[in-house]
Amino acid sequence: MKRIAYLWWALAFAILGSGAWIKSSHAQNAGYIAPSTMASAAINISTATTTKIITGITGRWTYITSFNVIAGGSGNFQLVYGTGSTCGTGTTSLTGAYNLTAQAGLVVGSGIAPALVVPTGNDVCVVTSAAVQMSGSIAYAQP
């Protein structure tokens, strides 16, 4: 009997330890983020522009688990969501505008739980205010 209990605990640990759990006010989306739904994208922008970095999926929320960025000069960095090629329709701020200076950066989130939540079907874009290099990455899931 102890062997069976041990096997159940080992199986539960293996399953639950291989991804992240999310709790959300959106009951249909609360639960487990399987590793197969996790992805990442590079942030590599050198102009004052709005750049799509995550394409939304109809019927799926996007959970941003972490992002990091470092600036090569002074400029603002902001995450927004919306639809269209540059999130131009229904544009909504996910973050405030981070005012970065040369060689300054930031890290948000641990990568194992949602730091930011994007409603179903919306794209995620980066808005930069100056023609300076902004480099980093963003980790997300669309379960």
Regions found by a protein language model. Give the residues of each.
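Sec-dependent, cleavable N-terminal signal peptides
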Residues: 1-28
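Beta-strand-centric surfaces of beta-sandwich/beta-rich domains
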Residues: 29-143
